[in-house]
């Protein structure tokens, strides 16, 4: 019984310990609203990708490239690579650019800038 009394509070706190989700988060996880960049991605990048719309994807990637946060090396290069792939209607290349940015930069971005609008 003692062990159960110790473990249950830890289990209840575990979701708040997610490194990508600060305890004082004001956006990004339900029931909170989407964060500014998350909202923009859902409204612009996702529909264009779902429709495989090369011109809209290229435009979205160009917007991302021109709004690279200071200190995020590679952000603009990844976005420009995505824009080039979109212009070539290379959806696999587009997805690779998305994955590259998410793998390299998303975790840090979520910790440092998730609640700040970029666009």
Tell where the protein language model's regions lie, with residue ranges.
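Sec-dependent bacterial lipoprotein signal peptides
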Residues: 1-15
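Extracytoplasmic c-type cytochrome modules immediately beyond a signal peptide or single-pass transmembrane anchor
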Residues: 17-100, 107-119
């Amino acid at each position: 019984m003692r062990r159960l009394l110790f473990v249950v509070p830890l289990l209840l706190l575990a979701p708040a310990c997610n490194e990508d989700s600060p305890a004082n988060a004001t956006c990004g996880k339900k029931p909170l609203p989407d964060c500014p960049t998350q909202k923009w991605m859902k409204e612009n990048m996702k529909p264009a990708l779902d429709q495989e719309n090369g011109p809209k994807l290229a435009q979205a990637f160009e917007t991302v490239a021109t709004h690279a946060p200071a200190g995020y090396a590679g952000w603009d290069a990844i976005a420009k690579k995505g824009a080039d792939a979109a212009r070539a209607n290379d959806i696999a290349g587009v997805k690779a650019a998305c994955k590259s940015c998410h793998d390299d930069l998303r975790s840090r971005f979520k910790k440092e800038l998730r609640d700040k609008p970029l666009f």
